[in-house]
Amino acid sequence: MAGTADLPLEMRRNGLNPTEELAQVRDRDGVIPVGELYGAPAFLVCRYEDVRRIFADSNRFSNAHTPMFAIPSGGDVIEDELAAMRAGNLIGLDPPDHTRLRHILAAEFSVHRLSRLQPRIAEIVDSALDGLEQAGQPADLMDRYALPVSLLVLCELLGVPYADRDELRDRTARLLDLSASAEQRAVAQREDRRYMATLVTRAQEQPGDDLLGILARKIGDNLSTDELISIISLIMLGGHETTASMIGLSVLALLHHPEQAAMMIEDPNCVNSGIEELLRWLSVAHSQPPRMAVTEVQIAGVTIPAGSFVIPSLLAANRDSNLTDRPDDLDITRGVAGHLAFGHGVHFCLGHSLARMTLRTAVPAVLRRFPDLALSPSHDVRLRSASIVLGLEELQLTW
């Protein structure tokens, strides 16, 4: 697996586990300074209770003050363009703007509303498994299964043409790649907005029953066109790679724990608890976006000056012994309540129900279809580390 020594501390992994250094920061210090971010002091926060407290307190820890779209060094992004990019960007908003948009979206992401997609998710998974089997072995689970399943589910929800899947996959990877330059990210952002703007225009002209059509009908009613473009982009960006990575990494983790893979196949009661445990244990989103301390605050005995940024480490927090016993052990029978893989508070992941539905279908299905599933002995497992979301370059499997 690829090394991560050159990455920020919160992104470094020892395989699928926190590095010893990150674990020590959590257990010994709780909070440490990590230089500057956006020209202000920054602090890494690692303990479960402290991270949860930050998520719960949007009055003292602001998302709106984080420059989510930095102007590239070339200086060719004008302020009007940045304003359009920021509009509707839920992760970069505080109440009341965040509350207004969240209220518009909440009903469409309820468990009841999303349950209508469950039969289609099962069809998508079965079809992808057929394709994987027909491809012959060894086969790349990410390319043949995890990425297409995740993307097609989102396309079904939103009304995005699946024919554009290669373009969508490529652009999502570029937007999440922290090794890309500011100019490269700006190019990807522009491409993304142009594409999403075309979809929104089409939905306004011929609104369907998908999420894009439903929301297009609400433009002008407390929702702007720029906001809808950003919302659809964020749903696609936030839901595609994260769910695909969770599928691939969950299968990898269970292959390393065959007795637990067997339990997930044989006992339906283990599926829900198992997915919750895998969400906690893997924490594919290394951290959440930095938040700015609006006033001076104390965290774990450390003074955080007003105007400083805090970086909440999801991986460290979800492996905290204050959350669960033996936190570094994978145990699909425990199903820990309260993990922070989807965040907490007003920014709790809007798509958590859809992600859970997809994972509860896709992960056990591949294990059932291929009971002799194994890592290909002729291929190394390579993690995609320099990304906001931990992923796999590929996962070559035999059966």
UniProtKB/Swiss-Prot annotation:
CDD domains: CYP105-like
Induction or repression: During the interaction with host plants.
Alphabetical list of Pfam families matching this protein: p450
Taxonomic path: Bacteria, Bacillati, Actinomycetota, Actinomycetes, Mycobacteriales
Record flagged with keyword Metal-binding: yes
Protein name: Cytochrome P450 FAS1
Name of the gene: fas1
Family under the similarity heading: Belongs to the cytochrome P450 family.
Gene3D superfamilies: Cytochrome P450
Record carries keyword Repeat: no
Molecular function via GO: heme binding; iron ion binding; monooxygenase activity; oxidoreductase activity, acting on paired donors, with incorporation or reduction of molecular oxygen
Enzyme class label: oxidoreductase
Species the sequence originates in: Rhodococcoides fascians
Known role: May be involved in the biosynthesis of cytokinin phytohormones and in host plant fasciation (leafy gall).
Annotated residues for binding of heme: C349
Cofactor(s) needed: heme
EC number, UniProt record: 1.14.-.-
Keywords assigned: Cytoplasm, Heme, Iron, Metal-binding, Monooxygenase, Oxidoreductase, Plasmid
UniProt-annotated location(s): Cytoplasm
GO cellular component, one term: cytoplasm
